[in-house]
A protein has these predicted regions:
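Helix-coil boundary and N-terminal low-complexity module in membrane systems
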Residues: 1-104, 110-113, 128-214
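Generic alpha-helical transmembrane segments
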Residues: 121-128
Length: 214
């Protein structure tokens, strides 16, 4: 895994610079309001992250990482990556609206319960998204297949899922403390999660992974 990061360091860094540009666009959009920021996240950042994961998926199969693969994959998987991330973005927006309603109406337990349920569903969807884009990049599955496989992996590999979640949180915390760490966080995360997802997918869906177990 470390060799994947080292061998592909140039292309990972180059694609990370694109993600930086989109990240600044997200920040500027958030100054306007949450809806524009979420639109940037869904229609720009998610496809770009998928493109990086497609590069890394080539490496997981023993091929070289190439920027061309990311560009072609980003176009090919664009609408599927949007379809996978849009529900989570809409739910996040709903949670923020509900949180505002609860803060303005204290003492209404039914509103608090509804918000708690929304947060629970949102956290569950966020955990499933650990696998969603990597599965899409690795297996070229439909949106429905990708979602079902994400549920299957999260349910079958509970401890590995928790470990990936902790790694994600740790990388985000580190990047928050040191801004320049953002230069390596996207690449490191993609290498870790794509390789982990590839190993799991080969066990639960060998046919989709191109493995003949007959």
């Amino acid at each position: 895994m470390l060799s994947d990061i080292w061998d592909g360091s140039f292309v990972l860094l180059a694609w990370t610079l694109l993600l930086w540009v989109l990240g600044f666009l997200f920040i500027f959009a958030s100054l306007v309001g949450m809806p524009p920021a979420l639109l940037v996240a869904v229609f720009a950042i998610a496809p770009a992250v998928t493109g990086m994961m497609i590069m890394v998926s080539d490496s997981a199969r023993g091929k070289f990482m190439r920027l061309g693969s990311a560009l072609r994959g980003m176009r090919r998987f664009y609408w599927r990556s949007v379809a996978l991330t849009l529900p989570l973005a809409l739910l996040l927006w709903l949670i923020l609206i509900s949180a505002g309603v609860v803060s303005k109406n204290p003492g209404h337990s039914e509103l608090t319960i509804a918000l708690a349920l929304q947060v629970g569903v949102g956290l569950t969807m966020a955990i499933l998204h650990i696998y969603a884009l990597p599965l899409l990049a690795l297996l070229d599955t439909s949106v429905k297949q990708t979602a079902l496989l994400a549920v299957l992996l999260a349910g079958k590999f509970i401890w590995q899922t928790l470990a990936l979640l902790l790694v994600c949180i740790a990388l985000l915390a580190l990047a928050t403390l040191y801004l320049l760490v953002w230069l390596i966080v996207p690449g490191v995360w993609c290498v870790i999660v794509v390789n982990a997802t590839w190993r799991m997918a080969r066990q639960v869906a060998p046919g989709l992974a191109g493995i003949d177990k007959s």
